[in-house]
Structure formats: C-alpha cells, structure tokens
Amino acid sequence: MGWSNGPPSWAEMERVLNGKPRHAGVPAFDADGDVPRSRKRGAYQPPGRERVGSSVAYAELHAHSAYSFLDGASTPEELVEEAARLGLCALALTDHDGLYGAVRFAEAAAELDVRTVFGAELSLGATARTERPDPPGPHLLVLARGPEGYRRLSRQLAAAHLAGGEKGKPRYDFDALTEAAGGHWHILTGCRKGHVRQALSQGGPAAAQRALADLVDRFTPSRVSIELTHHGHPLDDERNAALAGLAPRFGVGIVATTGAHFADPSRGRLAMAMAAIRARRSLDSAAGWLAPLGGAHLRSGEEMARLFAWCPEAVTAAAELGERCAFGLQLIAPRLPPFDVPDGHTEDSWLRSLVMAGARERYGPPKSAPRAYSQIEHELKVIAQLRFPGYFLVVHDITRFCRDNDILCQGRGSAANSAVCYALGVTAVDPVANELLFERFLSPARDGPPDIDIDIESDQREKVIQYVYHKYGRDYAAQVANVITYRGRSAVRDMARALGFSPGQQDAWSKQVSHWTGQADDVDGIPEQVIDLATQIRNLPRHLGIHSGGMVICDRPIADVCPVEWARMANRSVLQWDKDDCAAIGLVKFDLLGLGMLSALHYAKDLVAEHKGIEVDLARLDLSEPAVYEMLARADSVGVFQVESRAQMATLPRLKPRVFYDLVVEVALIRPGPIQGGSVHPYIRRRNGVDPVIYEHPSMAPALRKTLGVPLFQEQLMQLAVDCAGFSAAEADQLRRAMGSKRSTERMRRLRGRFYDGMRALHGAPDEVIDRIYEKLEAFANFGFPESHALSFASLVFYSAWFKLHHPAAFCAALLRAQPMGFYSPQSLVADARRHGVAVHGPCVNASLAHATCENAGTEVRLGLGAVRYLGAELAEKLVAERTANGPFTSLPDLTSRVQLSVPQVEALATAGALGCFGMSRREALWAAGAAATGRPDRLPGVGSSSHIPALPGMSELELAAADVWATGVSPDSYPTQFLRADLDAMGVLPAERLGSVSDGDRVLIAGAVTHRQRPATAQGVTFINLEDETGMVNVLCTPGVWARHRKLAHTAPALLIRGQVQNASGAITVVAERMGRLTLAVGARSRDFR
C-alpha cells in the first residue's frame, strides 16, 4: 500500500470493496485515475524543481501575479516557485489595488522557504483599469514593513474600494495614505506609471524632481526608494540614470526590480494578450498603448547584477530592503467577536442555558432521555475546551432570526452530527437516535472552528445576509469571494478577441469547446495560436465574484485582515479572499446557503393553506406513509428534491424505497464518491437479494449493518475504527482525516500501527484479515458521503414528494415561483403536472398574480404575470397592486391608462393570451396593443395608432403553442412534439409512455425535445440525454463512440430522433443510443447542460 500517492481509481475501488484480487501489474493506487473532485483547494504541493541558486543576494520587490486580474500571467505559486529556483532571498507580491493572492503566496512561500513581502500597487487615477488601454493617473507602490504595515495597507485598500462606490473603481485619498503610513510602509517610485518615472517621461528631470520631493515630504527619506527597472525599452538606460542621479539630492535609497508580470519568459506572449483583453482591444489596435513586457519576468541575482552593473548598490539594497520588510502572514490571524450575552452569563453558560431549554423541547426531561443528555454534556465540554461557544451562539442567533421572520432554514453537513445543534434548533436530525458520531463534526484534535452550513430559502436569504451585516456592522462582517477563473470557452473567446478575430469567429470557436471537459471537441478551424494561448490562460483568474453563501465575522475591523470591496449586487461587500484563503488564515466563516427547495416548500405550504384551508406542519408529516414511497419507487420524481436527476430516477425503481432510511441511502448513493467507490451496484444487489450480505470480520457488522455491509458514509469509517480496533471517537476522526484528501504519511504510519495493535488485542485477528480490512478502509476514505448530510437532505426529499403526491397543483405552482432551481425547466414541470391531471392556465391580467398561483380550490395552476416577456417581477407586482387597489381592468385602454406599459410589453401580454379577459383573441389584442400603449392620457389626442380592430382569424393550436413559448417559455396546455405525432407515428416512433411495455434488449425509435445533456465526471466519457415528448420522459445513454459520431448534432440539436436498444431488466428504463437524427420542432425548446 502507498500512503502518499493519492486516492485509488474507480476500477481499483470496486476491486477493493468487493474483495477481489488485484490484477497482476496493477498498482494499489493510480495517481492518474478517475479521482473525485474536491470543492476545497488542497494543500500546496511544491513541484520539486531543481534550484539553480545564486551567489548574488537579491530580493524582487515589485511583482504582479494573475491576481492583478489581466495584468499578470503567472499565479502567486508560480512566482514563488521561480523565486525559489533562482535563489532569491525574498519576494514581494504587489498586485494592483489588493491583496487577492496573498494567502496562496504565503502558503507556497512557507513550503519553499522563500521570505515574503506584502504590498500593493495603488491606482490613483479616477477611472477603472479596464475602461481604456492606458488609463490616466499615477500608481503608488507600497510595501508593508511588518504586520502593522500590512494592517494599515489593508485598511486603506478597503477604504478606497468602498469610497469608489462601485466594483473596480477604488478612489484613494493621497493625504489619507500619507497619514496612514506612519513609518510602517516603504514606498518605491514605481514603474512607468509611478509618480516619479511618469513625471520624468512627461515633464523631464525638473518634473521628476518635484514628484520625488513630494513623496519624500509625505513619507520621509528613509521610507522612500527610487526604483530602477529595465524591460528592454530604448530609453530605459537613460531614464534609470536620470532617476539614480536624484537619489543623493534627497537622501533616498535606490533599488533594482524587474517589475515582474510573469514568472519566466515563456509567459511573455500571454501577458501581452491579457493586457489587450484588459484594454478591450486586440493586440494590433492596442499596440501603441501596451507597455513593453519582454523583460518583465523574475531574474536571478547574477542576472540583475549584470543588468545593473553600473549601479550594483541597487541590487544589494533590494536584498536588504526585502529582508527588512519580510514577515509571515500568520501573524495577522483574527478571532470571532465576543457574543453579547445577558448579564450574569458567560458565553459558555448562556450556550448551556439555550441548549438545555432546547433539549427539553426535543427530548423531554433528562430522566426520559439519559443518552441524549449525556451526549449533550460531552459536546458542551468539548465546545468549552476548544473555546467555540461564541460560534454556536452566532449560528443559533441566525437561525432564531429566520424562525422569528418565518424563513425556512436548516443546518446540514456534519453539524447534524451534533446534539447541541439539534437542541438549539439549528439542525433537524436527531444524532442520538441516528447514532451519529459527534467527532465527525468536532473533536479536541480539530485545528480550526467547526463548519456549519445553513440552508435558507433562496428568496429570503438576502434578508438574513443583511441581518448579519446590521447586527455586526459592515466593518466586522463581509461575504467571501469566489475567484472566477478562465475555463475552456471563455479562454478561447478572449484569446481570439486579443488576436483580432471577429466576434462571430470568437463565438463559433468557443462553442466548439465542450461544456464538460473544457477541451475543444473539434479543433478544426481554430488557429493554433488561439489554442496555445487559451491553454495557457485556463484556470487563471479573470475576475472576482461572490461566494454562494460564505460570510466572515471578525473581532476587529475586517479590513485589518483582508481588504473589502463592493460586489456587483447592491449592499453586498466582499472580501478579496475566497473560502479556502479565509480558512487558511483562520477567519471564521459561516455558510448561509440559498436552497430553492426550501422556498418551494414554503410557497407550497402557503398555497395549500390559502386555497384548501389546510395548515401543513412539515415536522409532523408521517415519514412512513407508504403512498409516498410507492410514488418514488415508480421514479415519479420530477421536481422532487435530490431524486429528480437521470441517475436518481434510474436508481429509484431498483432500490424500491420503503422506509425513510432508504431515502437517506438514495441521497448518498448517487454521488461522485459512492459511484467512484463502486458502492452503488453492490448495495442494490444486496438490497434485492441477489448477493449475500457478508462482512470481512464480525466486528464490522455493527457499523455496516444499516447499509448491508457496503460502506457508504464517512461516519462508518470512524465507527469501524472504534469497533474493530478500539479507537476513541476522536482518534477515529484523526484516522478519517489522515486517510482523506490531505493525506499525511506520518499520521498514517502511526495510526496504521495503532489500528493493527488494537484489532489484534480486541479480536485476536490475524494480520492477513487486518490487511484486508485496513485496505478497504483506506480505499473507502476518499469516497464516503457524510451520513448527517444525507439525513438532512432526505427530509426534504420526503417533504417535496409528499406535496407532489397530495397537492400536485400547489407543488407545481411553488416550483414555478421558486425558479430558477432544480433539474427541470418550467416547461417540463408544467408538462409533468399536466400528466398528473393538473390543469395549467396561462397568464391573465385580471386573474394572475405576479407569480404562479393556484385556482379552483387549489386544484389548478395559473401562471404569473412576471413570467411574461419584458414584464419582470417588479412591473408585474405594480400591475397586481393596481388591480387590487382599484378593481379589475375593464378593457385594454383601461389597463394602459392605469399602468404605464410600453408597446413591447403590451404586445407580449397579448401574445401570451393575458388580455383574453377583455373578449379579444390574441391577434386582435396584438393589433390593438400599439394603439393602447401609445394612447395614454399623457399623450396628445390623435398622435397614437389607430384603435380600430379589423376582423382577424384566430390562431391555430400550433400557433397558440408557439405564442405561449415565445411569451412565457411555457406552453401550458400542449407540448411541442404533439404537433408532430401523426408524422412520428408514421415513422414508427414510440411514445415515451409505451416504453414500459417493450422487452429488454429490443430496438426502438424514439423522439423528443432535449431537456438535459449530462456528462458526469464519474461516467468515463458516457453522456446522458433526457428526451421529453407529450407523454413522458426517456433516459438515453450515449457511449463515447456514438457521441463522437454524432457530436455536433447531439451537442446542439434542441430535439432528436434516436434509434437504440432498450434496457429495462432492473425496472429502470434506459435507451442505449446507436444512431441519431435531427427532429425539427415547430415550437422551440431549450435544454439544460450539466456536468
């Protein structure tokens, strides 16, 4: 067994878990195998490159990484690696207007023993860096002299970004910068945009002298150095000599830098292309503006000494200044702020008070639930020992706010392993009853704060985020960034733009790149230089986004730790670091995640109460109701949370869920880990009695009994260590972590010996048995899914399935209200509701709300006005408010006189049939739209269109369907394929509803609109297509060979004819495609493509 060479491949996992012998010549682990993708950035791994070293001491004090966003062509890690290879004694990271790459820079430097200097190049101009090829305004290069200098710099960066009022336009106050420095910064005169060099270029030596005098007056001579750079420009030598001549006059030092924008010369062409993208020009059109970058790479001390042989003291001074400014980033680690507790309480005592009150509600008095109270005492002791009570109080406060404001929320993930979280009402899963291990969530050996994810109704999450801002203050709370990186399509498009190709070519070539692989499916016609540059820029940062839910709360102004800037969304401020950066530096993060299904469930509850008079309490639903499980076993799960995907619908008939824990297993089975770990088929075979339930050793039975001897959950690995080898729960968590994605050779060696010793002592097991068990544990460690997470989600599976079964109209309307969410488009959701007997009506200005609702005692659905093209939610709300306040609209002129609507908006309402309440056909309403919209009371008489409506024929069924789809995206009472059914029948095309009667292995011809294309990372190149006709849905499997033969058609066609072989031996129906053809629909359809 190897301990440090990564997780096993898919095939190897199946072999291990099934106890099969290894094939000759196959290694235990295949580093290039099909491994799971982690959402977390792994620990930095140095590349092991040979170091050339240097006999001349030198520190690079001016370097831009890719986190200067299109002004640097290497990652911070690549800069550090090259600095280590060259033997530099220190390296400064000085990205534009931020510390975006500081954590990555620090992590790499710590591994490679490179001293770090933190700084930034401030853009003092008033315009954004991306608005023109060469934005006006000077730059100021600031180096922090130690942690205090870092804090002051971070604060000033944040102040400038927030003062700018919008993303990407920092506004600095030069006097405020002067005051903030306080001797804790060192100022370099900068490159060509620096105050002094720019003054020299524009006004000659006298102007340069004045600019330098200003810097010295502001920051003192001991804190200013003249910067000499050489990028190969013809005037570099002359300008450097002039600048060096100013130094004695002002008593300032001289330092040499490379002004690096990339690590090594090979990235020079990419740097120029990125500069052109930043300028929104092609390389040719921006050539006159782009600064020469040929020499803007890191250099060794020897090379710098040769380049500045005429001024060797500049190279020496750079090394000395680097040593003086260098420090480690861990020195700025923050903490959580103290929580405001009632008088007479500490955080620990107040947490205990809240937990015990909640426990009495959840479990009753202590005598009735001794196990639960014992577990709570244990958890409170650990929380106090780790000094985390404040964290739990903050989370409780957030969930309390949600409950007080009627916002559905629930904690998930490993937090559901905690009885304290359950008692506080943070989670909905009882960990005591479900025998979950608390140490999976929190243990004394943990090296960071706990991680609690809170799912919140998507449509209400903004209220919760603003509550956190309000409670803690914008200075102490911010959202976590999400770094948007280049992927295949965006890389091809931007590189083609930089090279001057037309927008049409850019778009066409980018579409040749696969959604799934990021590689070009067909490189024919794409110029080699575009592919080369696109390959280089892939995975480099393009811009900063906002994390889906991460918020940081800090015990000091958060800008002391990391700069904050405005996000694109209103009233959102965002850190310059992502979630992994925050975790690495010790910032405490809370994940407030929007979950569309919680919004849908809330809407469904409200609709049922409003239209049927039934109050639904989700917590009191009968989780054993057979009818719900029977519906799911038929794979009747369109719209149902977590089990509506193609893979889940294929598994449900095989699993045949009968009890709640079956849903827990179903949620966990179709995940990358269990799929790659080979757990799916063994579990289903055992569940259906095909294979026997066997255990490698009797001690494994308690941990694996619930999953029939097949490991699915991470908690099972820990329980196996407890049961087999006598580990404590905390030791078991250490084993899980040591075996996980961040494998530790030393810890693995120690814990392996502990496991063997424990199993020998407890059970007298021979080494060959222990070998097999340990091998399975190690193989499984990377693939297990958290049982606590599956339990949390399984509740939502049941709740949503219950609504679909008992209140299908309310369920459909709720899903439409909560869009965008889920796996299916509104058209598919409406078609499914219709197949379940629900009548769906189009929008109507006198009957619709702004969003979808129910009618006829909750048995029918009415589409909302907000779904009509050009209207939007805000205008739809105004229209409904006017109708509510002043009565129904009596005519089209009455409507347009009371609500201001444009001609396109009235035409869209007419096309959608929303004006039918006025006794007008759609064509008549369209004819009258222009006159009505332009004939408002604020218009002069006679200037509008004619209001006379001639006799017009009505629309055909096909035209009505096309009008519906154009206006709302949904055809409420038809499906595009029904208009082709006669032709399809003549061709021998089988409707979806009849596939259940086809024998396994028979060949059929099917047709339908493509609703999804999906190629999971776990599927080894297989692509799944979902077709839908007016009778139902069909899952289609495309092997890599079939996909390759029909790639362009399969990838782009909105509807397909497919001939293939039926597979239904297991109860789940799939058609394995053999040939494909285009199907032309008279009414449009769109697909959703997933990884």
Swiss-Prot record:
Enzyme class: transferase
Disulfide bridge positions per record: none
One annotated GO molecular function: nucleic acid binding
InterPro entries: DNA_pol3_alpha_NTPase_dom, DNA_pol3_finger, DnaE2, DnaE2/DnaE/PolC, DNAPol_HHH, NA-bd_OB_tRNA, PHP_dom, Pol/His_phosphatase_N
Assigned keywords, A-Z: Cytoplasm, DNA damage, DNA repair, DNA replication, DNA-directed DNA polymerase, Nucleotidyltransferase, Transferase
Coiled-coil regions listed: none
SMART domains: POLIIIAc
Protein family according to the UniProt entry: Belongs to the DNA polymerase type-C family. DnaE2 subfamily.
PANTHER family (alphabetical): DNA POLYMERASE III SUBUNIT ALPHA, ERROR-PRONE DNA POLYMERASE
Protein name per its UniProtKB record: Error-prone DNA polymerase
Gene coding for it: dnaE2
